[in-house]
Amino acid sequence: MEKLTKIKHRIIPAKDSQNNSYKKVLKIKGLERGFGNTLAVALRRILLSNITGIAPFCVRIEGVEHEFTALEKVSEDIVTILSNLKKVVLNYDEDYVKDNQIIKLSLNANEDNRITSNHLTVTNAPRVEVQNKDVEIATLSKPGVLKLEMFLRAGRGYVDFEDNKKFIEEKEKELKELSSLSKGAFIAMDSVFSPVVNVAWKVTELNTASLKIEEQLELELETKLGVTPESAIKLACKILVAHFQTIGDLTDLDSDEIFQSEKQSLEKEEDDMEIRLLNLSMRSQNALAKSGIKTLNELASYPIEKLKEIKNLGEKSREEIIRKLNEYGKLKN
């Protein structure tokens, strides 16, 4: 077997990072031709959909039965408060949080005026921390009028509020035992578990005058507070290696950290990636969502010629969608 060129890699700050340690570029040199895109696509998919994180799945507010309401002496309505809570970034230690464990955060605000994420307190789990403590949640004109609890769990990818409603029904007894509030509904929220905000890549050819052309891969990665790009890349590589070990050497694999047991629910196939993870423009995402297209598979099965019939989907958006389908090998000729 002919040996491959030894590759070199390093991780450097992104050009526009402005000293942001959560935005980095992984550079890999000396790749055989074609390996740049091969590695980039695999790493990007793992980074966006398979890195574990922690996120809220529901909120309970004293005296509130649904999100389309308002509280006296509180400037913001409930929808706005929920939107603000989604901006709170949390970090946790996997060794201290069990699978399907429900974590509770309570809002402790005995003053009026501006209430922020600094007023949130974790009540039942060690090593869970609020990373951005300056997120504005609500403005009160009277102390103590907003009593709130936020419930979180660990997971991967994205879970919409409809699926979280089912989870709330399953865990209703446990939630009521955890809650300290006397009344109020458990209001479901979308959960964005992935700590990875964005992944982009660029492949350039090196020594093009030579008979043996090599490639350089630049993978730009941005993560949320508390999870460094380096740790996210390390975990993504670990997941990929475990899969390749399974295929190539079944006898020497210790895969308990990566794979679920056969009794556990299987994750959605990668082809059923949520539309929001494709990095389409917000206009394209909204238009597709209103047409009932939620996954990559559903988009791929939709006739290209019928895209023009989708409301608010212009020519540029259609071109963007076609490029994205081609990128994932889903474009039908």
UniProtKB/Swiss-Prot annotation:
Any GO molecular function: DNA binding
EC number: 2.7.7.6
Gene Ontology process terms (BP): DNA-templated transcription
UniProt keywords, alphabetically: DNA-directed RNA polymerase, Nucleotidyltransferase, Transcription, Transferase
Reaction(s) the record says it catalyses: RNA(n) + a ribonucleoside 5'-triphosphate = RNA(n+1) + diphosphate
Chain spans, region Alpha N-terminal domain (alpha-NTD): 1-251
Enzyme class: transferase
Keyword Lipid metabolism belongs to the record: no
Entry-linked CDD domains: RNAP_alpha_NTD (cd06928)
Classification via InterPro entries: DNA-dir_RNA_pol_insert, DNA-dir_RNA_pol_RpoA/D/Rpb3, DNA-dir_RpoA, RBP11-like, RNAP_asu_C, RNApol_insert_sf
Keyword Endoplasmic reticulum: no
Pfam families: RNA_pol_A_bac (PF01000), RNA_pol_A_CTD (PF03118), RNA_pol_L (PF01193)
GO annotation, cellular component aspect: cytoplasm; DNA-directed RNA polymerase complex
Sequence segments annotated as region (Alpha C-terminal domain (alpha-CTD)): 272-333
Family statement: Belongs to the RNA polymerase alpha chain family.
Job description of the protein: DNA-dependent RNA polymerase catalyzes the transcription of DNA into RNA using the four ribonucleoside triphosphates as substrates.
NCBIfam families found in the cross-reference section: PRK05182.2-5, rpoA
Domain remark in the UniProt entry: The N-terminal domain is essential for RNAP assembly and basal transcription, whereas the C-terminal domain is involved in interaction with transcriptional regulators and with upstream promoter elements.
Quaternary data: Homodimer. The RNAP catalytic core consists of 2 alpha, 1 beta, 1 beta' and 1 omega subunit. When a sigma factor is associated with the core the holoenzyme is formed, which can initiate transcription.
Name of protein: DNA-directed RNA polymerase subunit alpha
